[in-house]
Design a protein with these regions (language model features):
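Hydrophobic transmembrane alpha-helices and their immediate loop junctions
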Residues: 1-208
Length: 208
C-alpha cells in the first residue's frame, strides 16, 4: 500500500508572507484573494496527480516562488508521468480560468473575471522556463527524454539563467515607471535567486 502523500510536514517560508504583504499593499484585496486561491488550487492539482501515481510527500514548504516538495519517489516515475505531475497545476489553473470566464458571462461578472485572470496569470508565470517553475521542469524532462539527463539539465540551466536575467532587467525598468513595477522586480530577483540556488542539482529536486 502506498504511503499517504498528504501526511507531509507543512512549512511556510517568510518569503511567502512577504510576497503576500507586498501584494496587499499594491493590489486590491480581491486580487490578492484571487491569486492565493489560484495558487492553492495549483498546488492541489500537483498533489492530486502525485497521489494518483502513489508518490508520497515528506515535506511541503511554501515560498514566494511556490511550493517546494520533498518527494523522493517522484524521480522514480517515467518521464511521461513526471511531466504530467509537473503540468498538473497549470492544467488546473487553465481549466478554472475557462470555467470562471464562462460563468462570468452569466453572473458575478467582475468577480469571475478577476479570479479567471488570476488563474491565467499564474499559469503563464509557472510556464516560464525558469528554475524552479514548472516550465523549467517540463523543459528539463522533455530534453532529458530525448538527449539524456545531463544534457537536459545543462540546457535548462542555461535557458533558466538567461530568462531570469532578462526578467530582472525588465523588472528594474518597470519599477522605475510603474507603481506596482517593484513587485514584478521582487518576483524577478526571487526567480534569479531560485535559479542560482538550484543550478547543478540532480534530477529529483522538485519545486512545483
Amino acid at each position: 500500500m502506498p504511503q499517504r502523500p498528504f501526511s507531509a510536514a507543512v512549512r511556510v517560508n517568510a518569503s511567502f508572507w512577504l510576497l503576500v504583504l507586498l501584494a496587499a499593499i499594491v493590489s486590491p484585496l480581491t486580487v490578492v484573494a484571487a491569486i492565493l486561491t489560484a495558487a492553492a488550487l495549483h498546488e492541489l492539482g500537483h498533489l492530486a496527480v502525485m497521489r494518483y501515481y502513489g508518490v508520497s510527500v515528506k515535506r511541503f514548504r511554501l515560498t514566494a516562488l511556490g511550493a517546494e516538495l520533498d518527494a523522493p519517489t517522484l524521480a522514480r516515475l517515467p518521464y511521461g508521468r513526471e511531466l504530467i505531475v509537473t503540468l498538473a497545476g497549470v492544467t488546473v489553473n487553465l481549466f478554472c480560468a475557462v470555467l470562471l470566464a464562462l460563468l462570468g458571462l452569466r453572473t458575478w461578472r467582475e468577480w469571475c473575471f478577476v479570479f479567471a485572470g488570476a488563474h491565467l496569470v499564474l499559469a503563464a508565470f509557472n510556464l516560464l522556463p525558469v528554475v524552479p517553475l514548472d516550465g523549467a521542469r517540463a523543459l528539463c524532462l522533455a530534453l532529458s527524454f530525448f538527449l539524456g539527463p545531463a544534457t537536459g539539465e545543462r540546457v535548462t540551466a542555461a535557458v533558466s539563467l538567461a530568462c531570469s536575467l532578462a526578467l530582472c532587467a525588465l523588472g528594474l525598468k518597470l519599477s522605475l515607471g510603474l507603481h506596482s513595477g517593484w513587485l514584478f522586480a521582487f518576483a524577478s530577483f526571487g526567480l534569479l535567486w531560485g535559479t542560482l540556488r538550484q543550478l547543478g542539482l540532480a534530477r529529483g529536486a522538485k519545486s512545483v
